Structure formats: C-alpha cells, structure tokens
C-alpha cells in the first residue's frame, strides 16, 4: 500500500541500491482569499481592514502534509476581480477559497463559481466552527470554499482538506482518527451543530479552553487537539470521556 516515506525508509532504499521509485506528485493547491477588508501581512491595514492570515496558516498546514501551495493575490469584492483571480488558479489540482461563502451582499464566491462553470456539490454544514463550507468541481480541479473566520478556516482545513490531500497523494482516504480521554472540567450542553472545540491534551486529560470564538487564533495556537461535542449533546461532567482529534 502507498505510504509517506520517512528518513528510515529512504535510508533503507539507498542501502538496497534502489535509486529510483515511483511516487505520487505533490498536489498543487491555489489559495484564494477574498474581501475588500483584507491586506497582506507586511502591509499597513487601513480603517476597517484586517490582515489576510488564513492563507499563510493553511499553506503551512497543507505544505507540511505534502501539498504544494500557491498564495494568489487577494480577490476584491467584485465579480471581475474574483474571475481574474480564479483564472490564476487554472491547472491546479485544488482551489481553496477563503471567505466570501457566507450569506451577504458581498459574498460572491458561489455566484462567480457558478459563472465560470464550477459544479457545486454542497453548501453549508452542521458544524461549528465552519458552517459556510462549500465544495465542488471545476473540470478536473477540486474546489473547496472555506469560511473567512481564521479559526473556522484552519479547523475546516484539518477536518476536510487534509483527507483530500492524502487522497491525492495516494494515501488512505480516511477522516481524521478520533481518540478519547477524560475531561478535565465540566462542559455545557451543545447546540444543533457538532462542535470542534479548541482544547489541550495534558497529563491524560482533555482541557477545553473557555473561549471558543472563531476569530481567536491565539486560542487555536495554544491547542493541540480538537475536542468533539456531538449535536445536542447533554452536559458533560469532569471525568466523562470525550472524543478528540490531534492537531
């Protein structure tokens, strides 16, 4: 079965005088951020502007798992700008759009995607963070539309995009493996969407962070797991087991 080669694998191949082996190419992924409010890191944000952090976090995540990411220029909130930036993504194995997928006057990604022939497979999921997720196909190119909130984009990258990258690399097509451990504190009842809570696995227990706002990258940066609460889950007590996936 296909596998990702580590240092020992490569040393073993060399010791057996195997100079060449067949491999899967690294999938190319075009990252497309949208929004008039965005500026690139290194630029000075104006009033009501924010830094486009999502593309850099996602590129680091996906490159570390074998992808080859290209960060495209920021697309502004016009059909013409979005179409021009989509054109730069032509030929990629996957296009990831970030932002522009929620309901709103300036959320044009779905409209422009339809204009250029992207076939939408689904839009919106019962999950938090990450409700306004979309996916489709643009010829042979996979298209995934991620939410614009920083934590939402990265959580959806872990849950949905990494399995696609693995499939493109010929690795098993499986969702992130869930584990379980006791809670370090009580957790309130959950609402109608499955909740991927930022948490830390420490000394055999799951410590769920109190603040779970989808804009708080500082909390995600401290987390090493996502604790999973099913939709409509009852309150959980300290010591109850909870499922999680490692980050």
Question: What do these predicted regions represent?
Answer:
Residues 59-115:
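N-terminal small/polar loop signature for handling phosphorylated ligands or for N-terminal nucleophile
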Residues 36-37, 100-103, 148:
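Short glycine-rich anion-binding loops that position phosphate/pyrophosphate groups of nucleotides
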Residues 1-71, 226:
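Short, glycine/charged-enriched hinge/interface segments at domain edges or termini
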Residues 50-55, 75-80, 123-132:
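A general structural motif
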Residues 31, 62, 96, 199, ...:
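Residue-level signal for inorganic ion chemistry
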Residues 1-2, 17-23, 86, 123, ...:
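A generic local secondary-structure boundary/capping motif
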Residues 112-247:
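Flexible glycine/proline-rich
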């Amino acid at each position: 079965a296909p596998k990702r080669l580590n240092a020992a694998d490569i040393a073993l191949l060399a010791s057996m005088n195997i100079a060449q082996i067949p491999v899967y190419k690294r999938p190319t992924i075009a990252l497309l951020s949208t929004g008039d409010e965005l500026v690139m890191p290194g630029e000075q944000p104006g009033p009501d502007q924010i830094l486009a952090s999502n593309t850099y976090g996602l590129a680091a995540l996906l490159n570390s798992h074998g992808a080859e990411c290209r960060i495209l220029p920021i697309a502004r909130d016009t059909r013409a700008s979005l179409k021009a930036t989509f054109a730069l993504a032509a030929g990629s194995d996957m296009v990831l759009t970030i932002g522009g997928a929620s309901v709103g006057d300036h959320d044009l990604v779905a409209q422009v995607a339809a204009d250029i022939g992207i076939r939408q497979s689904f839009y919106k999921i019962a999950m938090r963070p990450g409700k306004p997720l979309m996916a489709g196909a643009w010829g042979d190119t996979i298209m995934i539309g991620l939410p614009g909130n920083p934590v939402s984009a990265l959580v959806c990258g872990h849950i949905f995009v990494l399995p696609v990258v693995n499939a493109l690399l010929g690795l098993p097509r499986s969702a992130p493996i869930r584990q379980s451990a006791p809670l370090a504190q009580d957790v309130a009842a959950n609402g109608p969407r499955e909740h991927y809570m930022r948490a830390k696995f420490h000394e055999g227990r799951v410590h769920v962070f109190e603040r779970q706002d989808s804009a708080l990258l500082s909390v995600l940066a401290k987390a090493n797991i996502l604790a999973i609460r099913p939709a409509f889950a009852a309150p959980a007590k300290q010591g109850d087991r909870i499922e999680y996936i490692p980050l």
